A protein has these predicted regions:
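Acidic/His-enriched low-complexity segments
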Residues: 1-198
Length: 198
């Protein structure tokens, strides 16, 4: 996320299974602009040329030029969004330092159906998935998520950034997912099963 202009960019890959003949994928999406979407099934990559939003229903329809093959595949998307000031979805939160300086952090509040403001998804509590979260953040900031950090590396193209990869979550609803970026301190210990907790 960019904590100066309050925007974020994302890349998402969804494992899915096409069970019925269709040329359209519909999912929840609010206050996000998808710049590209494609599906790869059976080694065939199909780019979408038509992405339509129903802002009132908070739904995006990704249209493909031909029917998708049946079977397992990957839906890949690139998108941008706003770190809003509405305290829902992926939003900015203002705080004041001890010397009186105003600063911002980026936090999430997805319950009950606001994950759609951070990434396109099927954002209903009954629909569950696992999540592999990777955050690209300023190297002087701390990022936390549901799971432990499994890898942290310097960004190859921007020395001011770092890439933080978290372990895969258990299968869960979108509203249970969380991540934060900011000037945080944290305590670290192991639970009774030896899992590192921050």
């Amino acid at each position: 996320p960019n904590l100066k202009d309050f925007t974020f960019v994302g890349e998402e890959v969804v494992e899915l299974e096409v069970k019925a003949s269709t040329d359209k994928i519909t999912m929840n999406c609010a206050e996000i602009t998808i710049s590209s979407a494609s599906v790869n099934i059976g080694g065939e990559n199909i780019e979408s040329k038509d992405i339509n939003y129903d802002k009132e229903q908070e739904i995006v329809s990704i249209q493909f030029p031909s029917k998708l093959q049946l079977g397992a595949g990957l839906l890949s998307m690139k998108y941008t969004g706003e770190l809003n000031d509405k305290m829902k979805g992926f939003y900015r939160s203002k705080y004041t330092t001890p010397n009186g300086e105003e600063r911002y952090c980026a936090v999430t509040q997805f319950e009950a159906a606001d994950a759609r403001r951070a990434f396109p998804c099927w954002d209903e509590p009954a629909i569950k998935a696992t999540f592999d979260i990777t955050m690209i953040v300023p190297k002087d900031k701390v990022t936390l998520s549901n799971m432990n950090v499994i890898e942290e590396t310097a960004h190859q193209e921007d020395s001011g950034l770092k890439i933080v990869k978290f372990a895969r979550t258990p299968i869960m609803s979108t509203y249970l997912l969380a991540f934060v970026i900011g000037e945080f301190d944290y305590v670290e210990d192991r639970d009774e099963d030896g899992v590192l907790v921050r």
